[in-house]
């Protein structure tokens, strides 16, 4: 089972918490309200709740993987999800996914969630560098990461990833 199954990270604008199966309808609603992200991720514009549930189950099944709901602190409403992994690949941590419902974008929730995750990785797990996966063709995701200090780099595997140093040595 994932190490992120009982995680809660508090912040002033949003907090991150491990969702349970009862949260799946709210997560589906986020994906329905973010068709651009869902299409880039799955290759299909048609929302499939089974695909969203499989992504959720897969994230919870892996060690060192955190799949967290993004909730507004003022209303406690679920506005997105963030998924990251520690201790894998060529880098100490990888952002696997971050989605905020379109109706909630531009309000700082995605930025706040990513900053909470980066601080958690640096302060709790000692991670100094994080890479990020961006689905092909998801230009909004690439622009978002670039605005937050991520840079596209070639890894030893010759693969290109978005990378950011989140703590000093």
Give each language-model segment a name:
Residues 69, 77-85, 94:
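Conserved beta-strand in the GNAT
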Residues 3, 13, 128, 137, ...:
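C-terminal "cap" of GNAT-fold acetyltransferases
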Residues 56-69, 80:
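A short helix-loop-beta-strand connector motif used in the catalytic cores of GNAT acetyltransferases and
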Residues 91-102:
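Conserved acetyl-CoA binding element of GNAT-fold acetyltransferases
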Residues 100, 106-120, 143, 147:
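Conserved acetyl-CoA-binding loop-helix of GNAT-fold acetyltransferases
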Residues 105, 131-142:
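Conserved beta-strand-loop-alpha-helix junction that forms the acyl-donor binding cleft
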Residues 1-57, 168-169:
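A short, well-structured alpha-helix characteristic of acyl/acetyltransferase catalytic modules
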Residues 123-133:
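Conserved GNAT acetyl-CoA-binding A-motif
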